[in-house]
């Protein structure tokens, strides 16, 4: 088993997103886990390790949060892991809110 090198643990999520190699972000997917430092995008779309990616998360308030990141790994026909690049204080605050909300959903009794 490989060692998990994350410094921030991801929480499970279900966030609609769009992504692509430019800000036009033509492909869609679902963020299924997220932390302040990165996320996993579930998609059948292709991504290459090291590729710069534009990502937009659909926030609960009904607006897009545009981010940029670098692909850490790709799992064919499953999705890719992304680390966020140079996020602003405002973007970090919004990501922290998303992570907190996802953590609360996880903790609810089934």
Question: Where in the sequence are the language-model features?
Answer:
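PAS and PAS-like sensory/regulatory domains
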Residues: 65-67
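Alpha-helical membrane-embedding segments
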Residues: 39, 70, 106-109
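Short, charged beta-turn/beta-strand-edge "cap" motif at the junction between a beta-strand
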Residues: 58-63
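N-terminal helix initiation/capping motif
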Residues: 1-34, 96-110
